[in-house]
């Protein structure tokens, strides 16, 4: 499916700034003859021509049942004008699996500190996962919060039945 889309996009007129488009091909000569044979009608042009402008025909679906030769280009054979492949020729599934380009200069500038170079007075700080706050604790587990729900009132009743002096958190 993707290769047939790429084939059709390479056949469009030279409105894209890529060196990948076949410039020797006349898009008006291409017709879908296999579709015309099965449905007993005249061949359908892929492109419509109005006022010397070429438009893609989206009204009728195109079936391509013939073998299609796709010419693949690498970055070494591209002309100087285009920097990389056109967005129409990039397979998103393949390029999503590749890692992004890493600048080697940034990697060389990273200083790796040996353990022997550290001072004896330095120590590693760990982030505390519990940040205590009296207001938040009372808001979530306090007496008023317990009394606002049915389950909370049940907990208060159980704590009183056990003889607890402190009935909330």
Swiss-Prot record:
<comment type="similarity">
    <text>Belongs to the bacterial ribosomal protein bL34 family.</text>
</comment>
<dbReference type="GO" id="GO:0006412">
    <property type="term" value="P:translation"/>
</dbReference>
<dbReference type="Pfam" id="PF00468">
    <property type="entry name" value="Ribosomal_L34"/>
</dbReference>
<protein>
    <recommendedName>
        <fullName>Large ribosomal subunit protein bL34m</fullName>
    </recommendedName>
</protein>
<keyword id="KW-0496">Mitochondrion</keyword>
<keyword id="KW-0689">Ribosomal protein</keyword>
<dbReference type="GO" id="GO:0003735">
    <property type="term" value="F:structural constituent of ribosome"/>
</dbReference>
<keyword id="KW-0687">Ribonucleoprotein</keyword>
<dbReference type="GO" id="GO:0005762">
    <property type="term" value="C:mitochondrial large ribosomal subunit"/>
</dbReference>
<keyword id="KW-0809">Transit peptide</keyword>
<dbReference type="InterPro" id="IPR020939">
    <property type="entry name" value="Ribosomal_bL34_CS"/>
</dbReference>
<dbReference type="InterPro" id="IPR000271">
    <property type="entry name" value="Ribosomal_bL34"/>
</dbReference>
């Amino acid at each position: 499916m993707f290769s047939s889309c790429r084939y059709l996009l390479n056949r469009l007129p030279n409105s894209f700034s890529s060196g990948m488009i076949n410039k020797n091909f006349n898009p008006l000569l291409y017709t879908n003859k296999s579709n015309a044979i099965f449905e007993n009608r005249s061949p359908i042009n892929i492109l419509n021509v109005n006022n010397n402008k070429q438009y893609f025909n989206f009204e009728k679906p195109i079936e391509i049942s013939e073998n299609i030769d796709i010419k693949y280009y690498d970055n070494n054979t591209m002309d100087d004008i285009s920097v990389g492949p056109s967005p129409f020729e990039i397979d998103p599934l393949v390029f999503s699996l590749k890692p992004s380009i890493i600048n080697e200069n940034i990697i060389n500038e990273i200083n790796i500190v040996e353990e022997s170079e550290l001072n004896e007075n330095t120590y590693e700080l760990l982030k505390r996962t519990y940040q205590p706050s009296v207001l938040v604790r009372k808001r979530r587990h306090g007496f008023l919060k317990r009394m606002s729900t049915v389950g909370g009132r049940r907990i208060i009743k159980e704590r009183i039945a056990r003889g607890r002096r402190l009935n909330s958190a």
